[in-house]
């Protein structure tokens, strides 16, 4: 074996070992398993896990949030119809209905292809991989981060 062939063989061996430890892009889940998914890290790689028991919150049951509900409903209707829609940031104290509004919209529009992916704040760095995973899907996805608070220094 020549020096060049030896070098190539060693380089291929090194690459194989590196590929084994580097994180892989998330694999596609069983999209029919749920209308909601959670992004989780498993062994250094991201995975979308189906949410087995999606909250059955309905928009009609949410009170004292009429202006927010109307805006979110209108925006989500546009989004699932494939029209321009705005990104949404709901702010407020704990227990004011932010998450409930999102889950109620999911239930309202799931039959029209709306899906939800919950991502922890620490995993937002993987957002490009998640977007790549869903880019060619026919469904419309809400990326949902339930606790996006920022501490001093972040």
Tell where the protein language model's regions lie, with residue ranges.
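Phosphate-binding P-loop
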Residues: 51-53, 77-85
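Pre-Walker A adenine-sensing motif
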Residues: 67-81
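Dynamic helix-loop-helix/coil hinge segments at AAA+ ATPase domain boundaries and subdomain interfaces
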Residues: 2-5, 47-71
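Interdomain "pre-motor" coupling segment immediately N-terminal to P-loop NTPase/helicase cores
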Residues: 1-50
């Amino acid at each position: 074996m020549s020096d060049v062939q030896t070098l190539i063989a060693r380089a291929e061996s090194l690459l194989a070992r590196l590929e084994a430890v580097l994180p892989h892009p998330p694999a596609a889940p069983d999209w029919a398993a749920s209308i909601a998914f959670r992004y989780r890290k498993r062994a250094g790689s991201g995975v979308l896990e189906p949410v087995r028991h999606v909250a059955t919150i309905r928009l009609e049951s949410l009170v004292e949030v009429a202006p927010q509900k109307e805006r979110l409903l209108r925006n989500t209707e546009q989004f699932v119809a494939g029209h321009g829609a705005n990104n949404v940031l709901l702010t407020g104290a704990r227990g004011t209905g932010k998450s409930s509004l999102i889950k109620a919209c999911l239930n309202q529009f799931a039959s029209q292809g709306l899906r939800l992916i919950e991502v922890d704040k620490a995993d937002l760095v993987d957002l490009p991989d998640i977007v790549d995973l869903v880019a060619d899907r026919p469904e419309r996805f809400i990326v949902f981060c339930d606790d996006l608070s920022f501490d001093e220094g972040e």
